[in-house]
A protein has these predicted regions:
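Acidic, Ser/Thr/Pro
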Residues: 2-221
């Protein structure tokens, strides 16, 4: 496994290289992003030191990046749209990719999608222009692997710790996340993968309860 990872502070445009070693958690700053590799059989832990912070996660088969995480496949195979432990997550080729082993918050959005400049403008008008967003964060994260925006899509994105509600009329609402300080999710890698995570920078809605907070990322020893 390549230990070098790529961490970017999206709010300042500063890029630095970190080393993600098993057993040594890395702090992902508010609005930041990270990319790294994980081997089959290793476990990824994503934690909320302060709670109420959403992460957008995408991942690729390291041996063929055309195969990537799929929320559609994951919902269809599990026959469930509230994916948490002990569910499996699947690729766009419907192969097992992750097993969720622990999930203290037990609240994730599996509909696919991420905030983007175009979406922010459509929803919030001019203030959305050039505002930090998960699409640009994820693109920045994977750039070091020779990939760009066109290597992933909204179906690939697992919105970890995100709370979304539907009412009886079909109204879709983003609500404040339920994560408490110290909550985490642990996922077992079932393929060798390239992983990218955006610490969601959205402040226009309740996704992060209107305050950006750090996350910690760790490959367990």
């Amino acid at each position: 496994m390549t230990e070098a990872t790529h961490v970017t502070k999206a709010t300042h445009g500063i890029k630095a290289t970190h080393v993600l070693k098993p057993g040594e958690p890395v702090t992902l700053p508010p609005a930041g992003n990270i990319s790294f590799e994980i081997e089959t059989g290793q476990r990824l832990r994503l934690a909320q030191p302060e709670g109420e912070q959403v992460a957008d996660l995408i991942s690729f088969n390291r041996d063929d990046v055309r195969e990537l995480l799929s929320m559609h496949s994951s919902r269809a195979v599990n026959l469930n749209w509230k994916l948490t432990a002990p569910h499996l997550l699947y690729t766009n080729r419907t192969r097992e990719m992750w097993k969720i082993e622990e999930d203290l918050t037990a609240e994730n959005y599996c509909g696919g999608g991420y905030c983007s400049e175009h979406l922010n403008i459509a929803r919030y008008g001019a203030p959305g222009t050039s505002a930090p967003n998960c699409q640009s964060n994820l693109e920045a994260a994977i750039r070091g692997y020779g990939m760009d925006r066109w290597n992933f899509n909204i179906d690939a994105c697992f919105n970890v710790f995100m709370t979304v509600a539907y009412d009886e009329n079909g109204v879709w609402e983003i609500r404040p996340p339920k994560g408490k300080p110290g909550d985490y999710i642990t996922m077992l890698a079932l393929l060798p993968q390239i992983v990218a995570i955006s610490n969601c920078p959205i402040l226009f809605n309740a996704c992060n309860n209107f305050r950006l907070k750090p996350l910690t990322v760790e490959i367990l020893a």
